[in-house]
Amino acid sequence: MKAAGAFRWTVAATVLAAMLASALSFRADAQSEYMRGDRMPYDAFDRLPRTDIEVPGGTIHVAFAPGDITLPKEKLLDWIRMSARAVTTYYGRFPVASLRLLLVPVDGGRIRGGTTWGYRGAAIRIPLGRDSTEDVLQRDWVMVHEMVHTALPDMPDRHAWLSEGLAVYVEPVARVQAGDLNAREIWQAMMRDMPKGLPQAGDQGLDNTPTWGRKYWGGAMFCLLADIDIRKATNNRLGLQDAMRGVLAAGGSHEQDWPIARILATADKAVGVDVLTRLHNEMGPKPVTPDLAALWRDLGLKRMGEDIEFDDSAPLAAIRKAITAPHVQ
């Protein structure tokens, strides 16, 4: 009896292990179908059940790859709505009429980046840690970052700094305008992280230096300088936000392929000054090192240990406030 009982337990354990291995294998295979390579799995996405979220100017079609996620589906949809609201606040409408949004459950408790495509229609894929909490979603920047990509035409890789830099710059500004962040947080982050975008030894300008720092923070620095210069030239009536709305109004979403010159010329036309084209002529082919310390001082930003203070008497304090203020039509 003992031998038979032991045998039955062994068989049961073997069967259970096989079932577990099969389930894990199925989950891995399912994930690989949606995470394989650097292309959006459009066909696989279109076979999944979808939930549609209506936003001003468009519809977000949300699909979940197979796998467990701890949070209820509605909490995830709320996160998407919150992110879309921030992007809509910045651009005046959602950038594309139709967006496929694929969430792929992965191990862990955080959002593991994202990717945006436009070659068969606007699409975003987000690997989402299955144990992510509501707090993680509330503080997330990735979803807004990826949605901002949908508002800019696709460009050759050498100009990826504009796409990534714009997303780095616009994401927190949009979230402040939507009431999801406070201005102190984003200026503190800019003061901390913007130096990562400064030219290093051997730099050959934004167009020719595809390092991580230059692509992301060098591009964000370009956007900040452009925003300030547009506002200086228009008596603070218009800014980069108006310029990029102009690109979108001209049909320049991520579903289009435009050369950078067309993007910048369209943006300049929208605000009536050639700031973006001029800045690109300066910073694209050769390294330019702005005096960030002087810039922060002029914007009225003072570092106080780990915190910052605002000096509203500074020369560019009004511009600093206008950048994060809700846009007035």
Protein language model annotation of sequence segments:
Residues S32, S253-Q329:
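Beta/coil-rich, acidic/histidine-enriched accessory regions frequently appended to metallopeptidases
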Residues Q31-D46:
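Long, contiguous juxta-domain segments that are non-catalytic but functionally important
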Residues D157-D227, A233-T234, L240, M244, ...:
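Acidic/His/Gly-enriched intrinsically disordered linker/tail segments
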Residues P49-M155, H159:
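Juxtacatalytic substrate-recognition/specificity segment
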Residues V11-A23:
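Bacterial N-terminal signal peptides
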Residues A23-S32:
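Boundary at the C-terminal end of the N-terminal hydrophobic targeting segment
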Residues T70-M82, T133-Q138, V142, D157, ...:
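Soluble non-cytosolic domains of exported or imported proteins
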Residues K2-T14:
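Bacterial N-terminal signal peptides that target proteins for export
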